[in-house]
Amino acid sequence: MSVAETEEGVFEATATIDNGSFGTRTIRFETGRLAQQAAGSVVAYLDDENMLLSATTASKNPKEHFDFFPLTVDVEERMYAAGRIPGSFFRREGRPSTDAILTCRLIDRPLRPSFVNGLRNEIQVVVTILSLDPNDLYDVVAINAASASTQLAGLPFSGPVGGVRVALIDGQWVAFPNVEQLERAVFDMVVAGRIVGTEEDGTPDVAIMMVEAEATDKVIELVEGGAPAPTESVVAQGLEAAKPFIAALCTAQQELADASGATAKTGAEYPVFPEYGDDVYYAVSSVATDGLAAALTIGGKAERNQRTEEIKAEVLERLADTYEGREKEIGAAFRSLTKKLVRQRIVTDHFRIDGRGITDIRALSAEVALVPRAHGSALFERGETQILGVTTLDMVKMAQQIDSLGPETTKRYMHHYNFPPFSTGETGRVGSPKRREIGHGALAERALMPVLPSVEEFPYAIRQVSEALGSNGSTSMGSVCASTLALLNAGVPLKAPVAGIAMGLVSDDVEVDGKTERRFVTLTDILGAEDAFGDMDFKVAGTKDFVTALQLDTKLDGIPSQVLAGALAQAKDARLTILEVMAEAIDTPDEMSPYAPRVTTIKVPVDKIGEVIGPKGKVINSITEETGAQISIEDDGTVFVGATDGPSAQAAIDKINAIANPQLPTVGERFLGTVVKTTDFGAFVSLLPGRDGLVHISKLGKGKRIAKVEDVVNVGDKLRVEIADIDKRGKISLVLVAEDDDSAAAAAADSPAPADAATASS
């Protein structure tokens, strides 16, 4: 790490990431050159070709009427960063891509808890992607850039925050892997954290604040080849491996802030508005504790919420005159008291608000085939959380086309998550998905990607929709379970079923033998209230053998390694229980729905693709019209043929093979052909796609002379014909076959041979 003033007012700090045999990556932060009117601005570079600008600004006046912290994070992808013009109609960037939205969430999650409580000034962080090597990912660079610019803005911010992607490649955890290296990775995770002190050996003590992780789509293949499986212990090792890299990035950001003079800013000009005064909390506690403690033992969410709202109304009525004009403080103090009672009961009694023990899972239910015409459907319930999963299969050409700075250009598996307001018994806006819905859908998608069959094994585009019909804790992990069930119901040959569970953590200082010690209690299958009042939201999805996806957010300054390892082990026990319940509903792929298309794959020579398509698509369109099948051709000669019934698909395949993989007809073969052209000298009949024969006018009259071909046949007529001759140039001469001749030939083929007949008569 190094820091320098490269020119007057321009400062630069560098962190070098050493990956051993995988080489080094250099992260460089620069301030003082671009966006100087922002409160804080930083240009972050990854090696030489990746360049991001982050600017942090704050409103002059606080929004005192807000009861939340108004932080906004935006990521602006500029297509010029990759030397491209946007593909939209207006040829300029529009709404943010899914990659940009997910990066916004990655930045927001560790940054938000790093601000002081009670801040009400509007804070906006805008990260603009200026240059990007197509072999690199920008999301983790954006986390560091956003943290660095916020650190320079003089805000009441307890950063800096460092973010790193580490991937398990050839048994080593590699930081900032590129796209090419990720092709060989077993597991990949983004980890963010900050330095909170110093270890006994003098190394920085890093508190992990956020984790977003997943197994790669090649994990099963790599593990079968000898790579380590991403088990709970391996994932825990990866989290520890990320800490030195985070420390280096945080140190570089701090050095930049020190050199530029930003650390001299105290943030005193930004007032803090406590949610309530101590006097209000004391009054609320005095009148509400007993009744609220009793209400929090009610098992049902609706009944419990109704009773707590009644108590809250009683408290407001009793204290309204004493604390006139401070009703919002009374409400905030009531919430704080609720949080204290919930946490106290968990830590001291290991008992939860719905009566469960700390490792108990709510009642589970799973069933499939609920939606009649859907290709696959399932309902998964865990307590009051209810998820409907619906699967739709289609041709591979229906894969999503992606126009963003990410490495993906198409997406064959699309997972969409919907969270309507009625799922929590409320009213609200419905319509286009919000960032939270996009994030939850992406998490469920990543959990299932490692077990999906390849396009060669299952040549379909797959759309999975998760409908959150009821919510009381981790609808995203419920979506993973419902999706596994629906995919199996649709006939998708998953490599293994996947289930997910949400874990929580509550910590407090307790007196033990006259000493105060920190006690951590890990909760299995958290409720919505336990998520809101707890210290950690830890979602883990996986098969019975390994983890496929993981998401962690914590409000603590670090979680001990043994606590995290224990949470992972506890999550596995719960996952295995859920998988057993799911297996009772369905454990192998069902037969495909009669409403789903049957897709068959064939190969044609690349030089025959043009012939199959025909001029302006004439040939392929005619095959589609005649057979009713859908046809999609890839550049490598792979042809996908889809139809709702087998005969239609086979008819299309036969026609394609006749063009691209032809077998020449022989003299004596009979066909039911279509007249495609008439001339003065005869009628051309299509025998196979791309292969016609001529019935001469002299052969059309059945022994009688005719003056005009159209007097006997017209274009579109069906004729039963036989190949009479094929000349040296391949031209085919045809003769008509009478229907009775054809029937006689068929009967002769079915009758016994003469020798057999003689034997029978004797």
From Swiss-Prot:
Protein's GO biological process: mRNA catabolic process; RNA processing
CDD domains given in the database record: KH-I_PNPase, RNase_PH_PNPase_2, S1_PNPase
Residues reported in the UniProt entry to bind Mg(2+): 531, 537
Subcellular location: Cytoplasm
SMART domains given in the database record: KH, S1
GO molecular function ontology, one term from the record: polyribonucleotide nucleotidyltransferase activity
Keywords tagged on the record: Cytoplasm, Magnesium, Metal-binding, Nucleotidyltransferase, RNA-binding, Transferase
Enzyme Commission designation: 2.7.7.8
Alphabetized PROSITE patterns for the sequence: KH_TYPE_1, S1
Any one annotated GO CC term: cytosol
Residue intervals of the S1 motif domain: 668-737
Cofactor names: Mg(2+)
Listed NCBIfam families: polynuc_phos, pppGpp_PNP, PRK11824.1
Functional note: Involved in mRNA degradation. Catalyzes the phosphorolysis of single-stranded polyribonucleotides processively in the 3'- to 5'-direction.
PANTHER family, sorted: POLYRIBONUCLEOTIDE NUCLEOTIDYLTRANSFERASE, POLYRIBONUCLEOTIDE NUCLEOTIDYLTRANSFERASE 1, MITOCHONDRIAL
Protein name in the entry: Polyribonucleotide nucleotidyltransferase
Natural source organism: Mycobacterium marinum (strain ATCC BAA-535 / M)
Gene symbol of the encoding locus: pnp
